[in-house]
Structure formats: C-alpha cells, structure tokens
C-alpha cells in the first residue's frame, strides 16, 4: 500500500475526523485530524489496519503562534505531532492535531501506545499541553517548581534574558523537598500482601546509573516491586538552542546530544538540512562520513563492553578496551583534529579532506582489533560469572520492544533484524556489504553479544571504505553549501555574495518540514526540522533512542533483584545527554 492509499484508507475510515493531508518534503504522509478523534485514529493505525503501525517513534509539540509560512494548514496555536512506524511496511505516518494556544488540551494516547506518557509529559513540560487521562502529569526534564514552559515562543531563548536567579534558603529547602522520593508522587505502591515496602532512591549519584539519573524503587527485600525512572538532571535545552543558532552553527551541538556518538550525531541533522536544500553530497564526502561514523560506533561499543563487564564484577577488561579506544581516537584525531566532538561534517560535505597517510593509520587499527576481540570473548562472553549475571536477566521479546519504542541493539537482541542502514539506506550504505547481528533471547547477554558483533561489522565497513575511497571533491557545488568552496569565493560577484551571506547571516532554507533518520550507536535518532524561511530553525525536534529505552525500565524491572538492575542498566547502553538533551 502506497502512502496515498494509506491516507485514502484513513480518510474513508474516519470521514469527519480527517481534516487534511499536509504535503512535506519527507516521504512520510502527514495527516491532520480532529483532536477528539485522536484515540480512535491511533488505535486504528496500531491495532486494526493491515500490517499495523506498532511503534510510536516520537510525539512532540510545535508552537505555531510565530510561524509565517503555514499556507494550506489548519489553524493551530499549538500542534501535537505523533510519528508512527510500521516495520512490516517499512513506512511511517505522522498524525497532527491543532490545539488552542492559550489553554492547549489533548487526549492521551497512553491507552494505545505504552510509551506515550513520557512524550506527553515532555510536551506538557516544554509547551504546557495538558493531556487528559495522563497518569503522571509531572514535569519530566525540568525541576519541580519551574515556572513557565520554555519552548513556547514567548519564552526567552538565552539565560541572559531571564531574571536574575537567587537561591534563598527557603527556596533551597522547597527544592530539596520536591526531590524527595515520595511514593505517592511517583505512583509507587507502599504495601504488598500486607507488608510495607521499602522506598529506595537509586541514584542520582551512583556508579551503576552511568550518569546523573535516579530510579525510585519500591522493594520487598531485594526484589523490585515497582520502579519509576526520574530523568532531567542533564537537560541543557538543545532544541531551544537550535532556534537561536544558524543552520550551520548548530552543527557542533549535535555532537553533544550523544557525546559518545561523535560525528554520528551530525548525520541525521545534515540529512534533513541537505534534503531541504536539494544538495547532492559528493561520493567521497559520503564515504568519509560512513567511515568516521563506524569508527565512533566502535569507540562507543568498546566503552559499553568494558563497563558492562565491570558492572558485573570484572575489572580488567575495561582497562584493555580503553587502550583500544585510545588507538581509535588517535586515528580520529589525526583525520578530524579532535577526539570526541570533531564537528567535522558540513552542510554539503566535510570541513576538510583526508590528511596524507590517513589510510595507513586506519589499516593499522583494522589489523589490531580482530585479535583483541577474540581475547575479550574468552575474557567476558565465555566467563561463567558474566553469563550467570546476564543470561535470562531483563529479557523481553520483540512485541514488547516495539510497544516501548526500542530500537538499535536492544531491538535486534530480540531476534528482529531491523537496522536503518539496511532498511532505509542513507549516505551510500546500500553499496556496502555487512550483516545485521541479532540475538534471540532479548536478555542482557544477547544485548552484549549483538554490540560485540556490531564492532566486527563496523570493522568490515571501514575496510571497504579504505579499499574503495572515491576521489573527487569533499563539498557540494551548491550555493547553500556551508561554508562555500573557497576556490569559488572570489570567482565572480555572484559567488562572493553567496559566500558573504552564508558566512555572516547564514544559509536560508526553503520553508517546510524535513526529517533525517540515522542508525546511531544506540538506535534510531531522528531530527525533525521546521524552516520558516529564516537563517535559523523554527522548530528542531530531536528524537533520541535513550529516552525511549529508559522509559521501559518501569515495565522490565519489576520482579528482578536489585543486583540484576545493575546488569540491566549496563545492557541498555544509554547516555544521559542523549536522554535529557
């Protein structure tokens, strides 16, 4: 069924509820519906339609009050957009509803999609949208007591525009009290079978939480009865920052959304921007992008591998693997000039060409790693203690993973071979030979094995990049390429004007909505951009995999021991900046 046929079927089924179809530059059909039909439409798409849209990929809000280019769209003060995916169809659909700007209210779709509540809480936190039947109408990224909703267009975009903050003693006490592990506030039970449960603050300053993050637990002895993750301690307002940076200047921020993913964070953003501009990136630049992205996949997975072993009691592996990461970072630094946050990609290509001797450095790393991985397999994967701590622990199946929006290794460990690089090839991945590692049990052990095998596949991809690196330019010959090719800067008055505009004011993208999707180290990362014909983004929505993966803790943790929770958290492989943005 094509996208147009899907919209037709939806319009036929809900004649009075479907208001219009929005034409976007994406391949995703976008349909506006009446707010009172929200639950029925989402239930139809998830449960009743052939090859259903099982996964809620994202849900976000848009403040439309300052938007100028809205021709043909229904009147809206605040828009709620939900992004659904059908893996069987390899297709997505977006559903939008228009709300009042002053008092935005919508129906919760938590009864249809189990992972909707956190996204709805974020829409309330950032935009003030209240959802009916939302079980926990709490702020999620901002601290309790925060005044206002910062993503609204009436809210300041810089700290210097806000009133001076003064932490009085009474305010400090109030904030401390608000952070207490109150079971009623978190919806936790206090008794089971007549026995009082212990409420435990697990984090935020715990080595096992891998970042500033806490889980409020209800315990019966060592058994977890209920768990409520509490996030937001690392929130920096990345989406708000995008609204006050030019399209080009926001690039370094994308490296830091997932600070272990490096240049991979730049890929979905650039994919969306280049789609908006109609830029065709040269083959050499695309191949370099793939090579560096896979290098960072290896760097991340080595860190995961070592810390996962450490979380389950093995001390030595993490030191060996940090030695390997140091070798890898030397290669990355030699090529890009930086280690963890290179900011190496540009709109239309790369910041610079590969240096002399780059291939020798990469080949040395490729020759070094395989034997090391063989050693680690005996040290970790075949270790009886590691196997006892991970096999059968925190297991879930494919259906549960799709329900909670799990992507990446967490989904593939259940036996489902879904990888954006294969299903929806980008940047030239269709030209590379590699396999998708999968597990079968969906437990901590399989999630580890999948990532280890991904290291081997990344080595295979990188070797193909080195052996088949195209020649040619590293930047597109396009007026919106930023910065423009230097050799064209003084060619004539026209190129000089383009250079001046791009480097001073910044490139202006055509009005519209554009999306980039990439298989990053943790799963599906998606940038949904709205351009209003300005040098900066009108709305940048960043969908990260870690956000969805942590929400699932409340469904997986009950029934396991506290010690098993350590292994489960390690196997998720999340980064708190990726969660909180």
From Swiss-Prot:
Substrates-to-products reaction catalysed: a quinone + NADH + 5 H(+)(in) = a quinol + NAD(+) + 4 H(+)(out)
Family according to the record: In the N-terminal section; belongs to the complex I 30 kDa subunit family. In the C-terminal section; belongs to the complex I 49 kDa subunit family.
Annotated signal peptide: none
Assembly with partners or alone: NDH-1 is composed of 13 different subunits. Subunits NuoB, CD, E, F, and G constitute the peripheral sector of the complex.
Pfam family of the protein (one): Complex1_30kDa
Organism the protein comes from: Rhodopseudomonas palustris (strain TIE-1)
Gene Ontology CC, one term: plasma membrane
Location within or outside the cell: Cell inner membrane
Topology in the lipid bilayer: Peripheral membrane protein
Keywords attached to this entry: Cell inner membrane, Cell membrane, Membrane, Multifunctional enzyme, NAD, Quinone, Translocase, Transport, Ubiquinone
EC number(s) given by UniProt: 7.1.1.-
Name of protein: NADH-quinone oxidoreductase subunit C/D
Superkingdom of this protein's organism: Bacteria
Functional description taken from the UniProt entry: NDH-1 shuttles electrons from NADH, via FMN and iron-sulfur (Fe-S) centers, to quinones in the respiratory chain. The immediate electron acceptor for the enzyme in this species is believed to be ubiquinone. Couples the redox reaction to proton translocation (for every two electrons transferred, four hydrogen ions are translocated across the cytoplasmic membrane), and thus conserves the redox energy in a proton gradient.
Keyword set includes Transmembrane helix: no
Gene expressing this chain: nuoC
UniProt-annotated stretches for the region NADH dehydrogenase I subunit C: 1-172
Sequence segments annotated as region (NADH dehydrogenase I subunit D): 196-581
């Amino acid at each position: 069924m094509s996208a147009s046929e899907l919209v037709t079927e939806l319009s036929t089924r809900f004649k009075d509820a479907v208001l219009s179809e929005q034409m976007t530059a994406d391949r995703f059909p976008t349909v506006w519906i009446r707010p009172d039909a929200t639950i029925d439409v989402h239930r139809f798409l998830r449960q009743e339609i052939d090859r259903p849209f099982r996964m809620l990929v994202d849900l976000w809000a848009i403040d439309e009050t300052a938007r100028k280019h809205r021709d043909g769209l229904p009147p809206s003060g605040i828009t709620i957009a939900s992004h659904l995916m059908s893996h069987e169809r390899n297709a997505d659909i977006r559903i939008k509803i228009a709300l009042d700007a002053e008092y935005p209210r919508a129906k919760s779709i938590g009864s249809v999609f189990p992972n909707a509540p956190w996204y709805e809480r974020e829409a309330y936190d950032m935009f003030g949208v209240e959802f009916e039947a939302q079980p926990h109408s709490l702020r999620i990224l901002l601290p309790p007591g925060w005044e206002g909703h910062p993503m609204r267009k009436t809210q300041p975009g810089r700290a210097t525009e806000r009133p001076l903050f003064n932490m009085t003693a009474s305010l400090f006490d109030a904030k401390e009290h608000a952070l207490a592990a109150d079971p009623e506030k978190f919806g936790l039970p206090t008794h089971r079978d007549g026995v009082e449960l212990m409420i435990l603050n697990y984090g935020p300053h715990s080595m096992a939480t891998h970042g500033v993050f806490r889980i409020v637990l209800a315990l019966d002895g060592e058994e977890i009865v209920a768990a409520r993750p509490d996030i937001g301690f690392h929130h920096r307002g990345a989406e708000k920052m995008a609204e006050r940076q030019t399209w080009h200047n926001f690039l370094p921020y994308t490296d830091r959304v997932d600070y272990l993913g490096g240049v991979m964070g730049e890929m979905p953003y650039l994919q969306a921007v280049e789609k908006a501009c109609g830029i065709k990136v040269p083959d050499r630049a695309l191949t370099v992008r793939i090579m560096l992205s896979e290098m960072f996949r290896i760097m991340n997975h080595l860190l995961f591998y070592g810390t996962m072993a450490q979380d389950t009691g093995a001390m030595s592996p993490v030191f060996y693997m940090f030695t390997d990461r140091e070798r890898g970072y030397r290669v990355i630094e030699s090529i890009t000039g930086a280690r963890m946050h290179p900011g190496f990609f540009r709109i239309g290509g790369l910041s610079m060409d590969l240096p002399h001797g780059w291939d020798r450095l990469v080949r040395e790393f490729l020759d070094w790693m395989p034997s090391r991985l063989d050693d680690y397999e005996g040290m970790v994967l075949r270790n009886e203690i590691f196997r006892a701590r991970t096999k059968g622990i925190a297991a879930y199946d494919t259906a549960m993973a799709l329900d909670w929006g799990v992507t990446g290794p967490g989904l593939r460990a259940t036996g489902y071979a879904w990888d954006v690089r294969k299903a929806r090839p980008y940047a030239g991945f269709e030209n590379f030979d590699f396999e998708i590692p999968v597990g079968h049990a969906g437990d901590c052990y399989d999630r580890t094995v999948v990532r280890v095998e991904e290291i081997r596949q990344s080595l295979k991809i990188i070797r193909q990049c080195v052996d088949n690196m195209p020649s040619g330019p590293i930047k597109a010959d396009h007026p919106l390429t930023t910065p423009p090719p230097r050799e064209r800067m003084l060619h004539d008055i026209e190129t000089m004007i383009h250079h001046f505009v791009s480097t001073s004011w910044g490139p202006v993208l055509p009005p519209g909505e554009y999306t980039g999707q990439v298989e990053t180290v943790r799963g599906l990362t998606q940038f949904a951009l709205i351009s209003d014909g300005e040098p900066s983004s009108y709305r940048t929505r960043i969908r990260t995999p870690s956000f969805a993966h942590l929400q699932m803790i409340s469904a997986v943790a009950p029934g396991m021991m506290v010690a098993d929770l350590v292994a489960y958290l390690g196997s998720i492989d999340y980064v708190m900046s990726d969660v909180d943005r």
